[in-house]
Structures are given as C-alpha cells and as structure tokens.
Amino acid sequence: MTSHLCCSNYSSPLPELLVCLHTEGSLTALLEVKAGQPLRVERSFEGYRLLSLAQKKQLGMQGAALSRPRLAWVREVQLYGNDELPWVQAQSLFPLSSLQGSARRLQQLKSTPIGYVLFKRSRTLPNQRFIKHTVDGWQRQTLYNWYGRPLLISETFLPQFCEKQLDI
C-alpha cells in the first residue's frame, strides 16, 4: 500500500520523497546514510548508444547537431541499499565530446557509484533538474555541468525504496 503512495500517479510526490528528488550534491551520499552502508551497484548496460532527439535536446544540443547522429557512453545501473530489491534505477549519458582527458575515467566506473567521482572535489555541481513521474516511479533528470562537460543522469526511485526507506 505504501508504495502506491510514493509511486502512483499523483500530481506531485510526497514530501518525504521530495527531499531525495531535490537534494543538492551527491544522491549517493544521501542514500548511503539511509542504508547505513555503501551502495551496491549492479550494471544492466554499459556501452555506446546513439542519442535520441529528446536526449540531444536535454544535453543542450542545438541546430544542425540535433539532426546528426551522436554517440554517447551510456551506463544503466540499479542501486541497492540495505535491501534485496533495488532502490533506484539510474541511467547516465556521457556524450563522446564530454569524455575527454580525465573524464575518460567515467567509462571505467564498473560497480563504483558515479557520485564518488562527480562529487569528489565539490559538494555541489552546476545543474539543471527536471522531475517527472514515470511508470516505474518518480524520476529526477539532472543535467550536470562537470568541468564544462554536459552529463545527463536520470534516477528513478523504485517502490522498494519508497516503501522501506521513506516510512510512508
């Protein structure tokens, strides 16, 4: 019943979830506090994919760049706290143009939470955030400006997280 409160088709998320959706800084750090342990990351996909038109627009591409095929390094993971079921489903999009120099390490994350890398030197990063409801739950899509490079990260809060961790 409580998962319906968090992840049903309400016009806005409950206040308990709003804290997670709008947290500035590392979501990884917030989730690890809630779990009382490091997050476990399971990768479901990691590799190159063509960006969709919507993704190109979200990444700030304009004009002729929208009509050209663009590759990105895509990482899709499930984040586990202290439960058997995942708490968050996440997708990270790194346009190839963003993977220059030391940013290439973003292709080598394996089971490391991305928050460990993005927020290593700074507690917050310049970003634009969009919140929406999906069939899987409430999602935050954040376009980060990481050292002048755009990175798009989508994080969907799954029913298990809402039910067990938000006390709703």
Curated annotation (Swiss-Prot):
> Its Enzyme Commission number?
4.1.3.40
Source species of the chain: Psychrobacter arcticus (strain DSM 17307 / VKM B-2377 / 273-4)
Q: Gene Ontology cellular component?
A: cytosol
Under the heading HAMAP family, the entry gives: UbiC
Name its cellular compartments.
Answer: Cytoplasm
Annotated substrate binding sites:
75, 114, 155
Give the keywords, sorted: Cytoplasm, Lyase, Pyruvate, Ubiquinone biosynthesis
What SUPFAM superfamilies does the annotation carry? Chorismate lyase-like (SSF64288)
Which pathway does the record list?
A: Cofactor biosynthesis; ubiquinone biosynthesis
Q: What does this protein do?
A: Removes the pyruvyl group from chorismate, with concomitant aromatization of the ring, to provide 4-hydroxybenzoate (4HB) for the ubiquinone pathway.
Q: Name one GO molecular function term.
A: chorismate lyase activity
* Catalysis: reaction(s): chorismate = 4-hydroxybenzoate + pyruvate
Q: Which family does it belong to?
A: Belongs to the UbiC family.
Top-level taxon: Bacteria
State the protein's name.
Probable chorismate pyruvate-lyase
Q: Does the keyword Cytoplasm feature in the UniProt annotation?
A: yes
Where is the major localization of this protein? cytoplasm
Biological process annotations from GO: pyruvate biosynthetic process; ubiquinone biosynthetic process
